[in-house]
Amino acid sequence: MRASTVVLLASCIGMTAFPAFSQSPRPYTNKLAPYVASPAHVVDLMLEMAKIKPGEIVYDLGSGDGRIVIAAAGKYKAKAVGVEISPKLVASATADIERAGLSADARVMQGDVLQTDFTGADVVTMYLETKLNAELRPRLEKFLKPGARVVSHDYPVPGWKPARVETVEGRVMHTIYLYEIQLPKK
């Protein structure tokens, strides 16, 4: 999807209040994190742990097929934004959002999570590797306000102490980390 189409689509569906990217995303590679979808039961637990309230803004970093975005907007009535670098996954997720009738409250845009402005986000979800979480940490600290929640599937954010950790059994074990952004120490 071309950038002009994304901008036009965003303005048409009334979601222009969300911050834009500071730069064009780098070309798609899976070097940031490979695409692996979070199982439905893990998505449910991630969103339940985040305690999303209706109208809150949720960003899903590396949103893949958009399942977290769709669940956040559909079940929790959040304003949900996915950030995904793969144009094919963005197109697929956008089609799924439209089929679910959630275009007014959900979208997935093509972009690099390391260039994304999350200002205003109440919740950030992610299924990225620990190294990428470490690279994201300064941006999360810069853009997230006190009280915001970060939920990470399987990989911790180095240097942060989780407020809650849950292990989920299934075909494979999954660990969910919940972090709560605190006021800066003086």
Features from the language model and the residues they span:
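Class I SAM-dependent transferase core
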Residues: 18-53
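A short SAM/SAH-binding and catalytic strip from SAM-dependent methyltransferases
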Residues: 119-135
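Conserved class I S-adenosyl-L-methionine
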Residues: 55-64
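Bacterial N-terminal signal peptides
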Residues: 7-17
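S-adenosyl-L-methionine
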Residues: 86-120
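Conserved SAM-binding motif I beta-strand of class I
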Residues: 79-84
